Amino acid sequence: MSAQIENSIPLDFDLGNMAAFDISPLDETKLSGSEKESFLFSLSRDNVQQLVNKMISLPKERTSDGVLLQLPETVTPLPRAKPLPKPKPETKWQRFARIKGIAPKKREGRLVFDEASGEWVPKWGYKGKNKELETQWLVEEGEKEKKLTSKQVRNTSKKIKRSRRH
C-alpha cells in the first residue's frame, strides 16, 4: 500500500509533530517556468507520501474508537504565540506580611458549630450565626435598654443591634 519514493537528500522527520522537512534545493528552471504549479504539487505529494510511510511504520494501538498511532517525543520545539508570563511583583502588603510573619486567616476560623442544627455554619453573612438574633420573634431587653428614653432609643438603636450581634 505504501509507495517507495527516492530523494537525492533524505527528508528530516519529526513524527511527534507529524512533520517532514525537505532541505534539498529546488530546481530554479521549473519554478520560473509554466510548470511551477505541477512541480510544487508533485514535490509536495512525494514528501507527504514519505511522511505517511513513516507514520504507518509507528507502533499501533487498537481501541473501540479505531486504530491509534503511538507518536514519539517531538524533536522540533514549537515557538509560543506569546512569551512566558513574568512572575507578578510582590505587593507592599505581601512584603510586609512576609517580614512580620503574618499568615492569611484559615477558612476554619470563619465557621462556628451550630448545636441546634448540628452543622458548621459561617459566623457572618448568608445563613450566618450572626443572623440568629434577627430571626427570633422575641428578644429580651437588657437592663441598659430599659433605662433609655424614647429619644435615646432612636439614637442608639444601631448600637443595640450591633451589640447583640457580638
Curated annotation (Swiss-Prot):
Domain of life of the native organism: Eukaryota
InterPro entries: Ribosom_reg (IPR007023)
Compartments, as annotated in UniProt: Nucleus, Nucleolus
GO cellular component: nucleolus; nucleus; preribosome, large subunit precursor
Keyword Nucleus attached: yes
Phosphoserine carried by residues: 34, 64
Chain spans, region Disordered: 144-166
Residue ranges, compositional bias (Basic residues): 156-166
Annotated GO biological process: endonucleolytic cleavage in ITS1 to separate SSU-rRNA from 5.8S rRNA and LSU-rRNA from tricistronic rRNA transcript (SSU-rRNA, 5.8S rRNA, LSU-rRNA); ribosomal large subunit biogenesis
Record keywords: Nucleus, Phosphoprotein, Ribosome biogenesis
Record has Acetylation as a keyword: no
Role, per record: Involved in ribosomal large subunit assembly.
Assembly description: Component of a hexameric 5S RNP precursor complex, composed of 5S RNA, rrs1, rpf2, rpl5a/rpl5b, rpl11a/rpl11b and syo1; this complex acts as a precursor for ribosome assembly. Interacts with sad1.
Similarity section: Belongs to the RRS1 family.
Full protein name: Ribosome biogenesis regulatory protein homolog
